[in-house]
A protein has these predicted regions:
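Positively charged, solvent-exposed patches that mediate nucleic-acid binding
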Residues: 1-126
């Protein structure tokens, strides 16, 4: 991940959960918040509900790969937390990738083209 560093501190995750914008899909929940940094920071969360360590690591790898392939399109200067859901382990990768791009556009992390939906300040995705 060229333009991104890891988000590691627990208080940073909690701040994003409480104050960040969020977007929900069947594969994951994405929380983001604008920062003053020039680079973005990414955190990936997989709960014990997903299964054993092998399944959780698989979900993390798949999410990291989706993020890596679209990292160049994303605006810099955001903290991003992606919370994996069960479908991120078993679902089709191309559908997961499509959901990721759609959620990032809704959150305003990928600049929307004319005529596309984008969240304003205080709006939540549906």
């Amino acid at each position: 991940m060229k333009y991104t560093v890891a988000l590691k501190q627990n208080h940073e995750f909690r701040r994003l959960y409480s104050k960040g914008k969020n977007a929900v899909s069947p594969y994951f929940v994405i929380y983001c918040r604008k920062t003053r940094r020039k680079i973005s920071r990414l955190g990936i969360t997989t709960g014990v509900k997903l299964g054993n360590a092998v399944k959780r690591n698989r979900a993390r790898r798949r999410i990291r790969e989706v993020y890596r392939t679209h990292e160049g399109k994303l605006l810099p200067g955001y903290d991003i937390v992606i919370v994996a859901r069960t479908r991120s382990i078993y679902g089709r990768f191309d559908e997961m990738e499509h959901c990721f791009v759609q959620q990032m556009k809704k959150l305003g992390l990928i600049p929307a083209r004319k005529g596309e939906e984008r969240l304003g300040k205080g709006d939540k995705p549906q």
